[in-house]
Curated annotation (Swiss-Prot):
Keywords: Heme, Iron, Metal-binding, Oxygen transport, Transport. The keyword Ribonucleoprotein does not apply. Heme b binds at H62, H91. It comes from Ovis aries. Heterotetramer of two alpha chains and two beta chains. It comes from the Eukaryota. This is Hemoglobin fetal subunit beta. The lineage of its organism: Eukaryota, Metazoa, Chordata, Craniata, Vertebrata. One of its GO terms (molecular function) is hemoglobin alpha binding.
């Protein structure tokens, strides 16, 4: 659970995020760092190298879509399970995504935010974001339980 101040800090920083760039980088890094996650994206074309993945327009497009969903979830921080119920159902029942991948993507997102925002991404802000990405990962994994 986040305090009102913690929520405000997350929302304030996220308002500065370019979802297309950050989403593409986060998903791209996930696919590079954890290559077994690529099996869910084989239809995206060339995923043969880090350069191919990070330059792949389908990876960038889906990363933007993922971050837009994350952004919508920030509007419902007190009901993340409700906010992500339909996506949890899709990823569990139709796509059969390993729920551990949600945690991995959240951690990669924190890395990308730290890289992009440098000193502005303080340890306290990192802790707040870590709470949020953990909550989102748990909400997305909810259907699996």
């Amino acid at each position: 659970m986040l305090t009102a101040e913690e929520k405000a800090s997350v929302i304030s920083l996220f308002a500065k995020v370019n979802v297309e760039e950050v989403g593409g980088e986060a998903l791209g890094r996930l696919l590079v760092v954890y290559p077994w996650t690529q099996r869910f994206f084989e239809h995206f074309g060339d995923l043969s190298s880090a350069d191919a993945i990070l330059g792949n327009p389908k990876v960038k497009g889906h990363g933007k879509k993922v971050l837009n969903s994350f952004s919508e979830g920030l509007k419902q921080l007190d009901d993340l399970k409700g906010a992500f119920a339909s996506l949890s159902e899709l990823h569990c029942d139709k796509l059969h995504v390993d729920p551990e991948n949600f945690r991995l993507l959240g951690n990669v997102l924190v890395v990308v935010l730290a890289r992009r925002f440098g000193g502005e991404f303080t340890p306290e802000l990192q802790a707040n974001f870590q709470k949020v990405v953990t909550g989102v990962a748990n909400a997305l994994a909810h259907r699996y339980h």
